[in-house]
Amino acid sequence: MLLIRSKINITNLSFHRLLKPRALLLLAASSLLLGSFNAAHGTETGSNARSISNTTTTLPEQQATDIKNLPIVWVNVAKGELKVFGTLEDGTRNALFATKVSIGRNGSGKTRSGDQKTPVGIYKTEKFIERKDLPKRYGNGAFTLNYPNQYDKILDRTGDGIWIHGRPSEKEDAPYLDTKGCVDMDDENLNKLREFIQPKGTTVIISEEFEPTSLGPNQTAIIQRIQNWSNAWVSLDHESYMDFYDKSFFNGSRNYSDWDNYKGRINAFKSFINIQLSDFEILNYPEEEDLIWVSFQQSYASSNYNWEGRKITLWKKDNRHRWKIVFEGNE
């Protein structure tokens, strides 16, 4: 599995489109309808966006700078093992911590509520709940995970309450298949785990294979593809921009046709777009063929709206072996 945890800056600033007088009038008249942005979903809805100045700069070459030394958690459900990995200067992963864990009584591959399986996918820690706020069966506390994630929801996977937690002393040597879907370990190792990861925002990979030891061979190809996508976006060439989206695209509310119409409509009223992408995290999605999960920080500004936040895209190879977007949304 490819793993990239790096700070890669892709900056596209002010590709201006000349608008005819009538289009300029439409832009002004439409500002009340198309001038603001719903930051939670990335959709323009109102009239309180801030205007920014029209500046033009050249597009710099993409550069990979400092690799972010942010630990990730990997749960190998086939072996009942959890590891925490750090990153060396050359991008190689090294194990910082390892422990045996128990998973769902019915194994892995959760698809529905109550199936007592542990999900497979890429998740984030949301918070840590202390022992005093939990029943005894959770031991010294629990990290909550964001299952179901965006991809799970697209696949109609149900259920919730998937945690990484401790266990009471009388169950210190619990069997491999023992939980209702959570990942659990003895309290001593849970306390050690807390020393390495953050309560919120730590990446947790749950899979049957994969050990993240290197950046992998696809780094250059996928980063170049992302840069080409951002180039098409800021150019305001709608046809070129949509060519980066697969016909199977779905973001939970819009399919490919809906997205095509939506983006074409809102971008028609823009005179320029500025984009800066940075702090990439790139992973092959567990147990999926040719599906890459890309998370990054996005700073976006246009002639009628500004937004900054973290975004997720899922890229899949089409029948011509080109990486195309099948999902886009906010993290």
Spell out what each predicted region is.
Residues 23-35:
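Bacterial N-terminal signal peptides
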Residues 55-71, 101-114, 123-128:
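N-terminal post-signal-peptidase region of extra-cytosolic proteins
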Residues 1-18:
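N-terminal secretory signal peptides that target proteins for export/translocation
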Residues 115-120, 129-227:
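Exported/periplasmic cell-wall-interacting domains
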Residues 307-331:
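Short beta-strand edge/turn micro-motifs at domain boundaries
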Residues 238, 242-254:
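Short, solvent-exposed secondary-structure junction/capping segments
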Residues 117, 264-312:
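Surface-exposed, charged secondary-structure patches
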Residues 218-237, 244:
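Short, aromatic-enriched amphipathic alpha-helices that serve as compact interaction elements
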